[in-house]
């Protein structure tokens, strides 16, 4: 039975007690001698997970033992724990919480928690000790040999070994694609790339062409030409948790399909300048290929370009530093790595994107939005737009705002302006193509929902003129378009203009259904405003009041009430979208968005802000 909170092991004695348990047990002692190094880093071992709780806060009303048994190890941050198998992180534990139940609730497809629940249903005793539970499952070899079978398909004599129900469901060390890719140094086949196998969840174990899945433990060998690693994985192990998670996410988009393999990227470095202090192998592994110009490279996935390499530069770090949304980067290194690098450079692009609440900007094309620099830097705009290369681009007829935006991005990314007319023209042509595609998408959306488009275009005017907020809010709740929590958050705002701002932005985020209810409600409760917005389409915006005369306390209170994420309606906003400049969502909600929920402009980058 679990110890209560008051019986928690002290920080200084936890490791000693675990050590004494291991020494007294002959089975455990022999096991640790044989696999001491594995246990040192193996989070799939419950004893090792237990040992991570030496610094766990004492006031948490959930025992370390129950957390470790549920698959969690301590991250070292407050009371946050992480599952060694599915990566789920939980914190803010409350009295009465069941770690296993919360694990099942938030990540039901986790193979470890499924195995745990299945075992608890089948076992007559629910209080098996964690040590006995861990070592009651001997290795497949100890139980009478490997369970294997040959596929019955006449087209494939693949050897299949299914350990999914007999072994630890995850290999922590192989949970990242990069770690799996590095195991293929002795891979014997040329027709099936290690990158494809690693992407499909397999790491190399040998002998021959034998590979294993890090999640379900399934093993495959006897690969043949034209085999697809992901398809074979799904065919032989359809219930693998890795495949279930993969099927729920979209396959990431690739900017340059011809450069998606490591070998293809490496071949581009044939004429790489020998004086550059970064090696082609490093760059190719990080997703970059050479563009045959100076030391310029591009990512095959996100199309991000880097140059001016210096001694000590790490391509992976630079990739995460400048292009944190790259899907190849996230898949290979993991979101934690990207977050860590971003945390090292919190003010890297802080001068970007100061958006203004003016009606002109609200109705402007998001792609035409100019990146604004801070006060006193306007002279730099003049300088960067006066080079012969930039002037030549302007003389060709490109939009001045588009050229200015393109040049600013180039300087922020590389530290220098464009060197040749060919370089800038190539980028401008691509930007114009993107703008045309986005315009088509916007027109399609506007045709599908003219009401939503009108609300979006008149957002600032509605902030000022909408006074009957609560009846509309109640109608949205009654129609289940918003939740009770979202309803209460807006209702609790201290002033009507703040309620109106939150309501309008929530309608824009929720989409057509919310816009329709907003329109019908407005027609009933404020016919004048309804006529101006939806019939005459003639909303007037009046410049906002100057709050500088208010007390600092009042200014702070107003700002605090405007800083709620418009998606989750819970956390504080912290992400600025590029290029539109809207600051409306938190760090947790931003990755799931492809378009800004306010202006519907395509999100081409993000900048994290730190509001004080």
From Swiss-Prot:
Subcellular location, record wording: Cytoplasm; Nucleus
SMART domains associated with the record: BIR (SM00238), CARD (SM00114), RING (SM00184)
Class of enzymatic activity (EC top level): transferase
Regulation: The CARD domain inhibits the activation of E3 ubiquitin ligase activity by preventing RING domain dimerization and E2 ubiquitin donor binding and activation. The CARD domain-mediated autoinhibition of the E3 ubiquitin-protein ligase activity suppresses cell proliferation and migration. USP19 regulates the stability of BIRC2/c-IAP1 by preventing its ubiquitination.
Zinc fingers (RING-type) by residue: 565-600
Coiled coil: none
GO annotation terms (biological process): apoptotic process; cellular response to tumor necrosis factor; necroptotic process; negative regulation of apoptotic process; negative regulation of necroptotic process; negative regulation of ripoptosome assembly involved in necroptotic process; placenta development; positive regulation of canonical NF-kappaB signal transduction
BIR repeats: 46-113, 177-243, 262-329
Pfam families named among the record's database cross-references: BIR (PF00653), CARD (PF00619), UBA_BIRC2-3 (PF21290), zf-C3HC4_3 (PF13920)
Enzyme nomenclature, EC number: 2.3.2.27
Residues annotated as domain CARD: 447-537
Keywords assigned by UniProt, alphabetized: Activator, Apoptosis, Cytoplasm, Metal-binding, Methylation, Nucleus, Phosphoprotein, Repeat, Transcription, Transcription regulation, Transferase, Ubl conjugation, Ubl conjugation pathway, Zinc, Zinc-finger
Residues given in the record as Zn(2+) binding sites: 299, 302, 319, 326
Molecular function terms from GO: FBXO family protein binding; identical protein binding; protein-containing complex binding; protein-folding chaperone binding; transcription coactivator activity; ubiquitin binding; ubiquitin-protein transferase activity; zinc ion binding
Catalysed transformations (reactions): S-ubiquitinyl-[E2 ubiquitin-conjugating enzyme]-L-cysteine + [acceptor protein]-L-lysine = [E2 ubiquitin-conjugating enzyme]-L-cysteine + N(6)-ubiquitinyl-[acceptor protein]-L-lysine
Omega-N-methylarginine: residues carrying this PTM: 143
Free-text function comment from the UniProt entry: Multi-functional protein which regulates not only caspases and apoptosis, but also modulates inflammatory signaling and immunity, mitogenic kinase signaling, and cell proliferation, as well as cell invasion and metastasis. Acts as an E3 ubiquitin-protein ligase regulating NF-kappa-B signaling and regulates both canonical and non-canonical NF-kappa-B signaling by acting in opposite directions: acts as a positive regulator of the canonical pathway and suppresses constitutive activation of non-canonical NF-kappa-B signaling.
Family (UniProt): Belongs to the IAP family.
PANTHER family hit by this protein: BACULOVIRAL IAP REPEAT-CONTAINING PROTEIN 2, INHIBITOR OF APOPTOSIS
Domain description: The BIR domains mediate nuclear localization. The CARD domain is necessary to stabilize the protein and inhibit the activation of E3 ubiquitin-protein ligase activity of BIRC2/c-IAP1 by preventing RING domain dimerization and E2 ubiquitin donor binding and activation.
Subunit structure, interactors included: Interacts with DIABLO/SMAC and with PRSS25; these interactions inhibit apoptotic suppressor activity. Interacts with CASP9. Interacts (via BIR domains) with TRAF2; the interaction is required for IKBKE ubiquitination. Interacts with E2F1, RIPK1, RIPK2, RIPK3, RIPK4, BIRC5/survivin and USP19. Interacts with HSP90AB1. Interacts with several death receptors, inclusing FAS, TNFRSF10A and TNFRSF10B. Recruited to TNFRSF10B in the absence of receptor stimulation. When TNFRSF10B is stimulated, further recruited to the receptor and cleaved by caspases.
Protein's recorded name: Baculoviral IAP repeat-containing protein 2
UniProt organism field: Mus musculus
Taxonomic path: Eukaryota, Metazoa, Chordata, Craniata, Vertebrata
């Amino acid at each position: 039975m679990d110890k209560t909170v008051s019986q928690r092991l002290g920080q200084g004695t936890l490791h000693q007690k675990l050590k004494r348990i291991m020494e007294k047990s002959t089975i455990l002692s022999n096991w640790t001698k044989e696999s001491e190094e594995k246990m040192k880093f193996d989070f799939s071992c419950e004893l090792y997970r237990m040992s991570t709780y030496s610094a766990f806060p004492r006031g948490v009303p959930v025992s370390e033992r129950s957390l470790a048994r549920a698959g969690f190890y301590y991250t070292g941050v407050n009371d946050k724990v992480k599952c060694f198998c599915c990566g789920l992180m939980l914190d803010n534990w409350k009295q009465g919480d069941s770690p296993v139940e919360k694990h099942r609730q938030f990540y039901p497809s986790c193979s470890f928690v499924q195995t745990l629940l299945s075992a608890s249903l089948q076992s007559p005793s629910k209080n098996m000790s964690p040590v006995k539970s861990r070592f009651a499952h001997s290795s497949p070899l100890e139980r009478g040999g490997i369970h294997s079978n040959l596929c019955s398909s006449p087209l494939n004599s693949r050897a299949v070994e299914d350990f999914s129900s007999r072994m630890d469901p995850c290999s922590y060390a192989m949970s990242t694609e990069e770690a799996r890719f590095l195991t293929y140094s002795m891979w014997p086949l040329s027709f099936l790339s290690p990158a494809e196998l690693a992407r499909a969840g397999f790491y190399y174990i040998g002998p021959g062409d034998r590979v294993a899945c890090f999640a379900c433990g399934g093993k495959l060998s006897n690969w043949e030409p034209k085999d697809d690693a992901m398809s074979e994985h799904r065919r032989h192990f359809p219930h693998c948790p890795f495949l279930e998670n993969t099927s729920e996410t979209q396959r990431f988009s690739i900017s340059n399909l011809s450069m998606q393999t490591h070998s293809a990227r490496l071949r581009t470095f044939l004429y790489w300048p020998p004086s550059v202090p970064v090696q082609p192998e490093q760059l190719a592994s990080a997703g970059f290929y050479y563009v045959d110009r100076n030391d310029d490279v591009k990512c095959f996935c996100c199309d991000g370009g880097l140059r001016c390499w210096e001694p000590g530069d790490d391509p992976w770090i630079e990739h995460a530093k400048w292009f944190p949304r790259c899907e190849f980067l996230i898949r290979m290194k993991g979101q934690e790595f990207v977050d860590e690098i971003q945390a090292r450079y919190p003010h890297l692009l802080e001068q970007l994107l100061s958006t203004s609440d003016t009606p002109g900007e609200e109705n402007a094309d998001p792609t035409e939005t100019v990146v604004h620099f801070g006060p006193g830097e306007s002279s730099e705009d003049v300088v960067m737009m006066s080079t012969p290369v930039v002037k030549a681009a302007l003389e060709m007829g490109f939009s001045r705002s588009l050229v200015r935006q393109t040049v600013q991005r180039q300087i922020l990314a590389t530290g220098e302006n464009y060197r040749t007319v060919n370089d800038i023209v190539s980028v401008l042509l691509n930007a114009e193509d993107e703008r045309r595609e986005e315009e088509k998408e916007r027109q399609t959306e506007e045709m599908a929902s003219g009401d939503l488009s009108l609300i979006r275009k008149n957002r600032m005017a509605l902030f000022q003129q909408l006074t009957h907020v609560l009846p509309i809010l109640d109608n949205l709740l009654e129609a289940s378009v918003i939740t009770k929590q979202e309803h209460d958050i807006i209702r609790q705002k201290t002033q009507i203009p703040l309620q109106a701002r939150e309501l309008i932005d929530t309608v824009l985020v929720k989409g057509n259904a919310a816009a329709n209810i907003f329109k019908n409600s407005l027609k009933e409760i404020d016919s004048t405003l309804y006529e101006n917005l939806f019939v005459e389409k003639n909303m007037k915006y009046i410049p906002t009041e100057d709050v500088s005369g208010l007390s600092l306390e009042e200014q702070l209170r107003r700002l605090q009430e405007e800083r709620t994420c418009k998606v989750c309606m819970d956390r504080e906003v912290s992400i600025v979208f590029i290029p539109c400049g809207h600051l409306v969502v938190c760090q947790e909600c931003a990755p799931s968005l492809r378009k800004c929920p306010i202006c519907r402009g395509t999100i081409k980058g993000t900048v994290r802000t730190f509001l004080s």
